Curated annotation (Swiss-Prot):
InterPro entries membership: Amidase (IPR000120), Amidase_CS (IPR020556), Amidase_dom (IPR023631), AS_sf (IPR036928), GatA (IPR004412)
Job of this protein: Allows the formation of correctly charged Gln-tRNA(Gln) through the transamidation of misacylated Glu-tRNA(Gln) in organisms which lack glutaminyl-tRNA synthetase. The reaction takes place in the presence of glutamine and ATP through an activated gamma-phospho-Glu-tRNA(Gln).
Protein name: Glutamyl-tRNA(Gln) amidotransferase subunit A
Active site per database record: K77 (charge relay system), S152 (charge relay system), S176 (acyl-ester intermediate)
Biological-process GO terms, alphabetical: translation
PROSITE patterns reported in the protein's UniProt record: AMIDASES (PS00571)
EC number assigned by the record: 6.3.5.7
The keyword ATP-binding belongs to this UniProt entry's keyword annotation: yes
Family as reported in the entry's similarity comment: Belongs to the amidase family. GatA subfamily.
Pfam family for this entry, one: Amidase
Catalytic activity: L-glutamyl-tRNA(Gln) + L-glutamine + ATP + H2O = L-glutaminyl-tRNA(Gln) + L-glutamate + ADP + phosphate + H(+)
Any one GO cellular component localisation term in the record: glutamyl-tRNA(Gln) amidotransferase complex
Length: 486
């Protein structure tokens, strides 16, 4: 029997009332994964034996009635370090690496009774927006297996949208949670920068990376954010701010809420069908009592250029540690030390990772630093100021999550610029360190369209309040791909 249509609150009730055991639920989840995996390739590793052992231990001690996540399975993106479980970031260079420690979020999952059931596929080192850059295998879109699932958290989105798991963790550097959530018709949140510890997250761009939850519904998303948030002394960028109950405003009226609609988010490059769905969603929020007004974020058009300079520069620095000596892939038949470095990195990193390392190295070079990296930092400040100005008058910003719905597998592989532009609307949120969510808001040619809601720093509750109000009065989140029922 499959339980994939039940929320974690409903599953919790079944577990507390002993209508099902954690072991039975875990076995059902493993069956769901086995049935769907051949079509979507969301998982890189399923930790069946470990998961069953943990479930049996939970049954032995008894379900905690006060912890809604106790005994529930979760999938974890493969750039989040898990002790004793191979963690590769979907890269050949980390093949076979078994971490001796847990990421802080992995410990928090265990402390909340969540069972890590496997590691999820992704674009290599989280570099990519389609899911095609995994060095192992590409994940497929659950609505149409000829389409991309989005990236880089491709497996995190596909595993939830297909009904393999109810919950997953991803990471978001320029849209890597929100974009695949949009493409697969689920809920994905990038929390405020510093809200969730990055200790144990394999670094891509340290000033932009953030771990976040992907779920079928808004409430489950907030429940998972409750688990993973909080200050961590092991992460110097972790914020020591109080952590609220993120579900506290769910169900509250949104009458009088002021929502900004940036004109730049509906301009050139935005598909007409996507635009139509998002403007209809804005009208729907007006009917619920929100005040929606057009604003301008004038520097957002520079976001993609700024991002690819800053992110690539940080990546070129972060990825220096993969040298073929300390851990990971080591080339054979080498002549000297330099040859070891060159061959190990050339053979171990995929083409997109190499492209970004070269771009970053160029941006940081003596002749380009002022012209590129320094200038990008200055424009980043202008983007931050644009958001701050809008948030003086408005509670939230609304727009499409992506300019288009999912495209064909392989269609943009040889055109990196068109691939990069897919993150046009999500990147500014990372540059400003703000929280942003994608929720299902319609369909374009049978493929899901996501609506993005952007909030003030540390105000995820208001995002969840408005997202839940929209979800409760629409049925987009209830629509499921054919694969879900298999």
């Amino acid at each position: 029997m499959s339980y994939n249509n039940k929320s974690i609150k409903e599953l919790h009730e079944l577990l507390v009332n002993k209508e099902i055991s954690a072991l039975e639920l875990t076995k059902a989840t493993l069956s769901d994964i086995q049935a769907r995996e051949p079509q979507i390739d969301a998982f890189l590793k399923v930790t069946e034996e470990k998961a069953l052992k943990e479930a049996a231990a939970i049954d032995a001690r008894g379900i905690n009635p006060d912890v809604v996540t106790d005994g529930i399975s979760i999938g974890v993106k493969d750039n989040i370090v898990t002790e004793g479980i191979e963690t590769t970031a979907a890269s050949k260079i980390l093949g076979g690496w078994i971490p001796p420690y847990n990421a802080t979020v992995a410990n928090k999952l265990s402390q909340s009774g969540l069972i890590t059931i496997g590691k999820l596929n992704m674009d290599e080192f989280a570099m990519g927006g389609s899911g095609e850059n995994s060095s192992i295998k590409p994940t497929k879109n659950v609505w149409d297996q000829t389409k991309v699932p989005g990236g880089s958290s491709s497996g995190s989105a596909a595993s939830v949208a297909s009904g393999e798991v109810r919950l997953s963790l991803g990471s978001d550097t320029g849209g890597s949670i929100r974009q695949p959530a949009a493409f697969n018709g689920i809920v994905g949140l990038k929390p405020t920068y510093g809200r969730v510890s990055r200790f144990g997250l394999i670094a891509f761009a340290s000033s932009l990376d953030q771990i976040g939850p992907l779920t079928p519904t808004v409430e489950e998303n907030a429940q998972l954010l409750n688990v993973i948030s909080g200050f961590d002394k092991n992460d110097s960028t972790s914020s020591n701010v109080s952590v609220p109950d993120f579900t506290s405003k769910i169900g509250q009226d949104i009458k009088g809420m002021k929502i900004a609609l940036p004109k730049e988010y509906f301009g050139e490059g935005i598909d007409e069908k996507v635009k139509e769905q998002i403007l209809a969603a804005a009208k729907h929020l007006e009917k619920l009592g929100a005040i929606v007004e057009e604003v301008s974020l004038p520097h957002s058009k520079y976001g993609v250029a700024v991002y690819y300079i800053i992110a690539s520069s940080e990546a070129s620095s972060n990825l220096q540690r993969f040298d073929g000596i300390r851990y990971g892939y080591r080339a054979q038949d080498i002549k000297n030390l330099e040859d070891l470095y060159v061959k190990s990195r050339s053979e171990g990193f995929g083409p997109e990772v190499q492209r970004r390392i070269m771009l970053g190295t160029f941006s940081l070079s003596a002749g380009s630093y002022d012209k590129h990296f320094k200038k990008a930092g200055q424009v980043r400040t202008l983007i931050i100021n644009d958001f701050a100005k809008v948030f003086e008058k408005y509670d939230l910003i609304l727009g499409p999550t992506t300019p288009t719905a999912a495209w064909d597998l392989g269609a943009r592989v040889d055109d990196p610029i068109s691939m990069y532009l897919a993150d046009l609307l999500t990147i500014p949120v990372n540059l400003a360190g703000l929280p942003g969510i994608s929720i299902p808001a319609g369909f374009a040619d049978g493929l899901p369209v996501g609506m993005q809601l952007i909030g003030k720093r540390y105000d995820e509750e208001t995002i969840y309040q408005v997202a839940a109000a929209f979800e409760a009065t629409t049925d987009f989140h209830k629509k499921q791909p054919i694969i879900f029922g298999k």
